[in-house]
Regions:
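Glycine-rich phosphate-binding loops of nucleotide-dependent enzymes
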Residues: 3-218
């Protein structure tokens, strides 16, 4: 259900019924590129990076929603095109520093660990300057130290940049530790929603995520 939710919000799957409203605007039937222009960005459960490109080049791709190409900028590159290019690069360099990627900025993505690749995906999403950020299992495949780093970066992005974050995760300790509200899904069905302490105490959530035996033991 979570992948369907993400794809419905971002315009890849049209919902069969209901509406998707973002900041008062109905985006239900909106094309993905138009959703992105409404300051929605995402990361992917399965890494969607260009392995043959450097970390910096992958991150720069996130600026595509802000590009405004024109014949004039091409013809008068030194006066019109270059200043815009420098401005985009400045945003990327700031995010690289924010996510502590300076040491690998020029490395090919394929040479990085899973944890660093996930951080590059987050950087690419953040350079789009989103108001709504969707993170699809950003900690999958990470060790505990990498998870803690990523959790800290997500919290900093939310608090310092005023971003609303939709975090999709199976690690309940991470979810309960950093989320303000939780919605638990079981095969597309909402089985619990509310504050973290309310959701983890919900019998249906306990049964779905821990199993009946663990529920009775608790």
């Amino acid at each position: 259900g979570k992948t369907t939710l993400v794809n419905a919000i971002t315009g890849f799957y049209p919902p069969q019924k209901g509406r998707i409203v973002l900041e008062g605007a109905d985006i239900t039937a909106m094309k993905p590129h138009l959703v992105a222009k409404r300051k929605v960005a995402r990361t992917f459960q399965n890494l969607a990076l260009f392995n043959g490109m450097s970390v910096l080049d992958n991150i720069l791709l996130g600026r595509h929603v802000h590009l405004k190409p024109s014949v004039a900028k091409t013809a008068l590159y030194w006066w019109l095109g270059q200043p815009e290019e420098i401005a985009h690069r400045r945003v990327c360099e700031e995010i690289i520093e924010f996510l502590q990627l300076q040491g690998v900025r020029d490395e090919p993505v394929e040479s990085l660990s899973i944890g660093l690749k996930k951080r590059v995906e987050l950087a690419r999403a953040l350079v789009a300057e989103p108001a709504f950020l969707i993170l699809d299992e950003p900690m999958a495949g990470m060790n505990q130290e990498e998870k803690e780093y990523m959790a800290r970066f997500v919290l900093d992005a939310r608090d310092e940049r005023g971003i609303t974050v939709l975090l999709i995760e199976h690690h309940m300790d991470i979810v309960t530790g950093i989320c303000d509200r939780i919605m638990a899904l079981n095969y597309g069905e909402v089985i619990g929603t509310g504050l973290p302490r309310e959701v983890v105490a919900n019998p249906r959530v306990v049964e779905a995520y821990l199993g009946k035996g663990r529920q009775h033991a608790a």
